[in-house]
Structure formats: C-alpha cells, structure tokens
Amino acid sequence: MDIRSDDAKKPMMMWFLGMLLFSMVAESNAQLSENYYASTCPSVELIVKQAVTTKFKQTVTTAPATLRMFFHDCFVEGCDASVFIASENEDAEKDADDNKSLAGDGFDTVIKAKTAVESQCPGVVSCADILALAARDVVVLVGGPEFKVELGRRDGLVSKASRVTGKLPEPGLDVRGLVQIFASNGLSLTDMIALSGAHTIGSSHCNRFANRLHNFSTFMPVDPTMDPVYAQQLIQACSDPNPDAVVDIDLTSRDTFDNSYYQNLVARKGLFTSDQALFNDLSSQATVVRFANNAEEFYSAFSSAMRNLGRVGVKVGNQGEIRRDCSAFN
C-alpha cells in the first residue's frame, strides 16, 4: 500500500509523539545500567544464560516463545513482568485473548532462570530483568546478534487482562497502524521494522492469516500481494481443519535468526498482512530491502531496537517490587 502525500505526515507525527513519550520517561530509564547487579549479583547473566541454554536444549521453541513474551510484556504496562502473574479469576494480563497463545515454554524458561538466580542471589534480581536477559540469550542461541542488556527494572504491581486490548499489533495491521502502536511506546519506524524481524523464528496458527488465503475479496479469493506459489503452500499446510494447526512464519530457516524474513518480504512471501505491508508500503520498503541485502545491518538495528524496547515503561528505584515468585505479587 502506497501512502498518499496527504497522509505522509501522519506516520511522522506519530514518530514525534512517540519520541516525546520516550523523553518523558528518560529520567527513569537513565537508572538502568548494564552493570546494575555488579555488586549484588555479579554472576546473574551467567546464571540466566546457563538456565536458558539448558531449556533451549530441551526444546527449540524456547527461543521464539521467550522472545515473543518479552515483546508482549513490554507493550502492556511496560517491561515489568506483569505478563507472568497468575490469577484465580483469570483476569490477569496473561489471560487476555491476545496473550492466550503465548507458549508455555516462554514462561517456563524465565521461571527456571528465576529459580536458579534466587538460589544464588535471593530477593535481588527482578523477573523483568531475567526476562530481558533471557530474550537476548535465546536470540544468540539461534544464531542472532549478541548485545548488552540494561538492567535495574522492578517488577510491576498491576496485571489486568482489560489493559491489553489495543496495546499489541494485530496481524492484519497496515504500516500506519503499526507505526501508531510502536510510536506510543517511544519506538521508531526503524525499530518497528527491525523488531518485526523476530518473525524469522517461530510459528503461527493458521487462523491468524487465513483471511489472506480464502475469500480475501469478492473477486480475489487469495491476497494478490502474496506470491501465488507461497499461497498454495500455505493452503496445503492449513488444509487440516484442526484449529491448532500451525506453520512456520519463515519457511526458509525457521530455527535460525537471520535476515531471510526480509528476503521473503521482497519475494512477497510474508505470512501476515502486517509482515508483507512492510515491503508494500513505500515508507518502510527501503529499510526492508536494506535488511534483506545486509544481515549485519539488520543485526545492528535489531540490537538497538531491543535495547529501546527494554526501556519501555520500566519501573525503577522505589517503583514496583522484586518478586520472589514471578507468577505472584509479593
């Protein structure tokens, strides 16, 4: 979709609003530090890495599950581990419809890492920081870039399913819709495109993109922006009426963190509408092409975007708490 010149200022306006929001929380973000636990739990990164690696060796879904959980957590209430809270009434953040598909392996990864950390540094390291470290570690385990993680987040005291609605990008969004959501969290267009590259690993239920394969429009049953051969592959893969049927988001290298996601977009093989829109829209197309042609440029942008994501809505200082159990408030 090309954005008309009359509308071109709207995404830019959202970026400026997002940057304003980001500057408003800069003071609290400044309290994050790469060596935050240098004196209180100096081995925290090694402890988390060992726990994550052990879990990853048990199942490769650990990587996409943990990375996706970090994204979902940060976009609702900020990066504060609010997505881990369990509620008997099933009204916590994790119970929202948009979070019900979060894989159990993501929860298990952080819980096991938290247990390992608590055995060495009881009551010191937040679940939010452990999730941030685990998200970095799984990226490295599947071949992605290694980057420094800022620490010092506190765990949140609020977790409500009702606050999730509208906070997470849907697979049917266009670039304008994506920009609005990311900018509301202080993230730029480049951040959004780079973070979308996390779709190079993981899978999706067929119902999340079925509208592109069947009854797309009155005259076109299949989305015309999708490569026809790829469309037939998906139709065949999703022929099973089982609602739990899944396909890999990146059919070329599902378990490797690389830039093939962007190469697929250039070839019109993006799984979600929101994926393919990144190439179809002129405001994001050039960046997609750069990332498709240069893996190192993508890795650099992704590393920067992950650090920016990790600063969203953080609780620091006297805000929040250090949970003893990630699934329950103290």
Swiss-Prot record:
Cofactor entry: heme b; Ca(2+)
Function comment: Removal of H(2)O(2), oxidation of toxic reductants, biosynthesis and degradation of lignin, suberization, auxin catabolism, response to environmental stresses such as wounding, pathogen attack and oxidative stress. These functions might be dependent on each isozyme/isoform in each plant tissue.
Residues making up the signal peptide according to the UniProt record: 1-30
Pfam families, per database record: peroxidase
Top-level EC class as recorded in UniProt: oxidoreductase
Binding site for Ca(2+) 2: T200, D250, S253, D258
Species per Swiss-Prot/TrEMBL record: Arabidopsis thaliana (Mouse-ear cress)
One GO cellular component term: extracellular region
Cystine pairs: C41-C121, C74-C79, C127-C326, C206-C238
This protein's name: Peroxidase 55
Stated family: Belongs to the peroxidase family. Classical plant (class III) peroxidase subfamily.
Induction statement: By methyl jasmonate, a plant defense-related signaling molecule.
EC number: 1.11.1.7
Site positions per UniProt: Transition state stabilizer: R68
Gene: PER55
Any one GO biological process: hydrogen peroxide catabolic process
Note: There are 73 peroxidase genes in A.thaliana.
Subcellular location: Secreted
